[in-house]
Amino acid sequence: MPGVTSQSAGSKYDAIPGPLGLASASLMGKVALVTGAGRGIGREMAMELGRRGAKVIVNYANSAETAEEVVQAIKKSGSDAASIKANVSDVDQIVKMFGEAKQIWGRLDIVCSNSGVVSFGHVKDVTPEEFDRVFAINTRGQFFVAREAYKHLEVGGRLILMGSITGQAKGVPKHAVYSGSKGTIETFVRCMAIDFGDKKITVNAVAPGGIKTDMYRDVCREYIPNGGELDDEGVDEFAAGWSPMHRVGLPIDIARVVCFLASQDGEWINGKVLGIDGAACM
């Protein structure tokens, strides 16, 4: 029977948490905050969370117009949404964002840390300024988003960080700074899963690979030998060949996994980094 409450096996340590038989896709009654949600993967995360019933706070750093488009689309899908401007490279802005987010609906159940920047360059050419730019958002920013998430999430909440398959791959030329900034997230996840345990909050990360966003073709050319010589169709064909499924990943592929981790079904997944690349990096 849907909604049946689980029965304890006799100890508080072996009771199945939550009701049984609920629609696994549902996030009704939850409130989510997604950073960098005005475009790309973050946009689709916010949209899919809304489609599954969550109220969504759309964070953006620059374009209020694109963030408002996401807000309106979520409302059109039948849920509710609001937007907050904050640059996650600035810790003061992160703190302010969480304070404002908590005031909107009085609670916070899910935090998706998505904001990030990409960078390419041979080690010999990397400047301190470029190193700091990338790590300020991809690594330091995610750390302090996580810190504030711990303070503001409800007991039993979910924190989902953004890694990259390049943090797991054997090595990508001219990509040390970006890959390093994402590889660090994997260590954060393992340690934070322990620290967050006293509030029953799970901490996981997704590590996408080859996702077709608005920046996809330009970025893909950097991964492809002589990629600058390929037209758009050639880029698509080459990138599709990375996966035995012979297609590229889409933002919805990431969003669905994020929603699973945010749901009741994902409760016993903790301290893990899930590679989402169609087996491109086996």
Swiss-Prot record:
Biological process (GO), any one: melanin biosynthetic process
EC number: 1.1.1.-
Active-site residues, Swiss-Prot/TrEMBL: 164 (proton donor), 178 (proton donor), 182 (lowers pka of active site tyr)
EC top class named in words: oxidoreductase
GO MF terms held by the record: oxidoreductase activity
UniProt superkingdom: Eukaryota
Family according to the record: Belongs to the short-chain dehydrogenases/reductases (SDR) family.
Subunit structure: Homotetramer.
Free-text function comment from the UniProt entry: Catalyzes the NADPH-dependent reduction of 1,3,8-trihydroxynaphthalene (T3HN) into (-)-vermelone. Essential for appressorial penetration of colletotrichum lagenarium.
Protein name: Trihydroxynaphthalene reductase
Organism per entry: Colletotrichum orbiculare (strain 104-T / ATCC 96160 / CBS 514.97 / LARS 414 / MAFF 240422) (Cucumber anthracnose fungus)
Classification lineage: Eukaryota, Fungi, Dikarya, Ascomycota, Pezizomycotina
